């Protein structure tokens, strides 16, 4: 399994709206359509208001990279720009099974 984390800083006053949008069919539904998709979660910091991580899991690194290269990832990130207070950062991880 392969995991991808998108680290973000959200405007603390818009976290509820960002969470609702993240969990919407428009966002989470679009991810579910991708080959190799397993799950996605929005992790919200309990220590730093507005700090969040979008965690997605994929069957393989190739599936995660195909999702990113398809343009779907950039499209979804662009929809979150109104909520961001800084640039998003993407990182990838192997998950030993």
Give the role of each language-model region.
Residues 80-84:
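Short, conserved catalytic or adaptor-binding loops enriched in Gly and charged residues
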């Amino acid at each position: 399994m392969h995991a991808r984390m998108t680290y973000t800083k959200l405007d603390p006053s818009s976290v509820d709206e960002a969470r609702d949008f993240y969990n919407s069919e428009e966002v989470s539904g679009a991810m579910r359509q991708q080959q190799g998709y397993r799950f996605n979660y929005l992790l919200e910091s309990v220590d730093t208001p507005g700090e969040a991580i979008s965690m997605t899991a994929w069957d393989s690194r190739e599936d995660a990279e195909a999702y990113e290269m398809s343009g779907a990832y950039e499209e979804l990130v662009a929809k979150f720009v109104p909520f961001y207070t800084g640039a998003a950062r993407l990182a990838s991880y192997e998950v030993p099974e």
